[in-house]
Amino acid sequence: MFGGKVKFSGRVFVKICGITNETDGRIAMEAGADALGFNLVPHSKRYIDIHAAKDWIAKLPEEMCRVAVVADANWEDVCRIGRLPFVDALQLHGSEPPEFCRRLADAGIPFAKAVPVSGSKSLASLPNYFTDTMILDSSENGEFGGTGKTFPWKFAPEFVRHHRGINVILAGGLDPRNVSEAVKLVRPRGVDVTTGVEASPGRKDANLVRAFVEAARQPFGSVQ
């Protein structure tokens, strides 16, 4: 549920996350990314104040999906952010329970739910999060997302096969060198990257961004 701007069909969907400035946003857009992620989690190295950044985010081309990443924020703040005119969708990247997600779906706010993957059991008994878009990400020493570490991809293909109604986005330690292999193995609808295309935390490397987008779409050309 990334909103009407995203159609999960055809080529591999690519989201570049941890965007902190307009220049990096345009680099990702020109490289062919489908979505940009803005981290609103206060302790993150890539945190931005969404209101301070609203002018340059709003100036990004309308065809680009703008995703606000939140984690365990309170209900009022999540709804307020999700209804901002320059935010197209939310990404819940904390331990938000299914009931919270159900309320968000009932409110008509587009969102994706990220879940940590550490083994087969972490995917075997996932509850209903009331969204058609889920992000499988790695967890390292209690830190979830933006770790630069992969999780064992062998656990993901079965989940993708058994959840055809879910748009699965693969994240966690992806970079231009491994994303092609990951897409071949897992067959996700999309991929999400932060650390793997950075020159430093919060600053993107244009060459890495371009290489990542190209490599992500190389294996099949399209996703069935």
Regions from the PLM with identified roles:
Residues M1-Q224:
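Conserved N-terminal beta1-alpha1 strand-loop-helix module at the mouth
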